[in-house]
Amino acid sequence: MTSDAELIKILSDASSGLLYQTELDYPFEVLILENTDKTAINKENILKLLKGLPVDYIEDYDFDFLFSTPTLEQYWHSENDKKRVVRYRNLVSLIKKNLKDIKVFRKGKIYIDVYITGRAPSGNIAVVSTKQMQT
């Protein structure tokens, strides 16, 4: 079984140097929410665990749609762009391989916190987070 520390390293290494590109580009962060093995993965619990306010706008979001653009190779991509696509595909694969019950939540409307959540092998909730900006 992969430990929480090993999982953080695996996902951190895979996302290191990648920026989620919207109107502003943001890196990824990986964390484990300790003692959450009996906590349901839902909007309310994630908001509470990540110190959001009950009035914060939060929505469910589709995991595959979130990564549909960064994992799509285009004919006009440079060699560096193609390498980045491969890295994104690897990150998506590692998330799917290592986490169960994957759910994505977006908090906010313009400056958006994105939480990719799932159940780590330990049972705790793992979070891969980034930010988006949409005007």
Q: Where on the chain are the PLM-derived regions?
A:
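N-terminal "domain-start" segment
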Residues: 1-84, 89-92
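Amphipathic alpha-helical binding modules
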Residues: 94-135
